[in-house]
Regions:
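Short glycine/serine/proline-enriched coil/turn segments at secondary-structure junctions
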Residues: 34-38
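Two-metal-ion RNase H-like nuclease active-site motif
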Residues: 24-33
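Metal-dependent phosphoesterase core characteristic of DEDDh/y 3'-5' exonuclease domains
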Residues: 40-57, 91-155
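Nucleic-acid-processing active sites and adjacent nucleic-acid-binding tracks
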Residues: 57-77
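N-terminal accessory regions of nucleic-acid-interacting proteins
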Residues: 1-23
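Short His-Asn-centered micro-motif
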Residues: 28, 88-91
């Protein structure tokens, strides 16, 4: 398993702090070997959070052997405890159910009910007509907004 952490600065990101006050926000994304929660596994979890100076820390847990899914899930669950708000893109439909199901396989309980949730996909979906031909896939929204990618960065 590889764990990597780095910091970046960006003035182009929307400042969600204004919407959430003093609450600590964790942005996260997962990468999986497929869409089946039962047959496929999570090989990467990326998480980002804002520092007091406006910079962002990014941490990634990568299962480079195909045998460390349990390790990255345990590390993510422990890390998650430090936050109040969980932000993602289509996480309510994909990422969170996938994490919960894969955690249950190993006896790891993820209780997302205690967090305030922010799913960017659900926020922009009502405005789909404004995006014309876009499918609202994460990559297309990133290109459209010309922003720092919402997902994880390559190791």
């Amino acid at each position: 398993m590889i764990s990597k952490e780095y910091t970046f600065y960006s003035k182009r990101l929307y400042d969600f702090d204004e919407d959430y006050g003093d609450k600590k926000i964790l942005y996260f994304d997962i990468e999986t070997t497929g869409f089946s929660r039962e047959n496929n596994h999570i090989y990467l979890i990326g998480a980002a959070y804002k520092n007091a100076d406006g910079s962002f820390n990014i941490i990634q847990w990568f299962d480079d052997t195909g045998k460390d899914e349990i390790k990255i899930l345990l590390l993510f669950r422990e890390f998650l405890k430090n936050f109040d708000v969980v932000a993602d893109y289509n996480g309510n439909s994909f990422d969170i159910p996938f994490v919960i199901q894969r955690g249950l396989k190993y006896g790891i309980n993820f209780n997302f009910d205690k967090y305030e949730m922010f799913d960017l996909y659900k926020k922009i979906r009502p405005y789909k007509k404004l995006f014309k031909t876009l499918s609202l896939k994460q990559k297309q929204i990133e290109i459209f907004l010309k922003r720092v990618p919402l997902g994880v960065h390559a190791l």
